[in-house]
């Protein structure tokens, strides 16, 4: 969504070649990250999440690794035409996610890859579609805290399973209630803070304000539980990304 909005604001089609390429490169990164996560967590999943692809027999460990390599190949192949900066920023985001999968997911520093990878995402997209970086200069400062909140919300969903295997991720160190409260509070603070800044600064857009409000309501209802918070944050991520692009265009 961000790439398409930035492209139209530059006077280009919403689905221009750069937008399609950057979308495919991000998709490749997601495939790499997801497949590598399944491979790295196969032992854990066999104990507590047997519906995951490897323990369920849907794919073997080698197949998961092959899929991860394929995702990386897709990311690189579609990033090269976008230029060196987009290629390197995208690889940095994927490298950060890889450190989570292979090393940091069970440590108190489990939030760091989320902070880095998601903060790099708007820069990756903007450089890919050729938008001026000043357009999204403040975005990483806002995306980062939201990403940490998303990490906490996600790990609270798996709190019992992680506790069963002795995971030491940040949510486990903080405790279920504290981690959930921080996740909800940080996400709400980001939404309220950004919305207030736009209104006070006069950078308002009717559709953007509506999307911002929808995202805030989606997060607010998440106070009812971890699953609802996670779903609400997914909705907010889409709404707030579009709202940001419209308000700063």
Question: What are these model-derived regions, one by one?
Answer:
Residues 1-6, 112-130, 171-176, 231-248:
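Small-residue-rich segments of transmembrane alpha-helices in multi-pass membrane proteins
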Residues 2-40, 75-76, 80, 84-98, ...:
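Membrane-embedded alpha-helical segments that form the functional core of polytopic membrane enzymes
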Residues 38-45, 107-115, 131-137, 156-163, ...:
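A cytosolic-side transmembrane-helix exit/cap motif
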Residues 22-24, 42-90, 167-204:
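Multi-pass membrane catalytic core of lipid/isoprenoid biosynthesis enzymes
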Residues 20, 24, 28, 67-77, ...:
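Lipid-exposed faces of alpha-helical membrane segments in multi-pass integral membrane proteins
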Residues 199, 203-249:
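Extended hydrophobic alpha-helices typical of membrane-associated regions
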Residues 5-17, 114-159, 163, 176-188:
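Functional transmembrane core segments of multi-pass inner-membrane proteins
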């Amino acid at each position: 969504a961000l790439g398409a909005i930035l492209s139209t604001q530059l006077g280009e089609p919403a689905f221009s070649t750069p937008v399609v390429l950057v979308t495919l490169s991000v998709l490749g990164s997601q495939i790499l990250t997801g497949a590598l996560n399944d491979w790295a967590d196969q032992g854990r999943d066999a104990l507590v999440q047997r519906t995951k692809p490897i323990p369920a027999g849907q794919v073997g460990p080698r197949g998961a690794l092959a899929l991860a390599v394929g995702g990386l190949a897709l990311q690189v192949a579609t990033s090269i035409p976008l230029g060196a900066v987009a290629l390197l920023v995208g690889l940095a985001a994927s490298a950060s996610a890889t450190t989570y999968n292979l090393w940091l997911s069970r440590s108190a520093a489990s939030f760091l890859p989320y902070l880095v990878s998601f903060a790099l995402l708007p820069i990756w997209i903007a450089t890919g579609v050729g938008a001026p970086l000043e357009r999204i200069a403040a975005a990483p400062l806002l995306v980062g805290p939201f990403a940490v909140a998303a990490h906490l919300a996600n790990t609270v969903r798996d709190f019992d399973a992680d506790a069963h295997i002795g995971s030491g991720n940040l949510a486990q160190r903080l405790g279920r209630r504290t981690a959930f409260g921080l996740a909800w509070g940080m996400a709400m603070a980001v939404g309220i803070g950004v919305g207030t800044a736009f209104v006070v600064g006069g950078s308002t857009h009717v559709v953007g304000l509506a999307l911002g409000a929808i995202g805030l309501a989606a997060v607010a209802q998440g106070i009812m539980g971890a699953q609802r918070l996670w779903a609400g944050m997914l909705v907010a991520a889409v709404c707030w990304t579009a709202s940001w692009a419209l308000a700063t265009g």
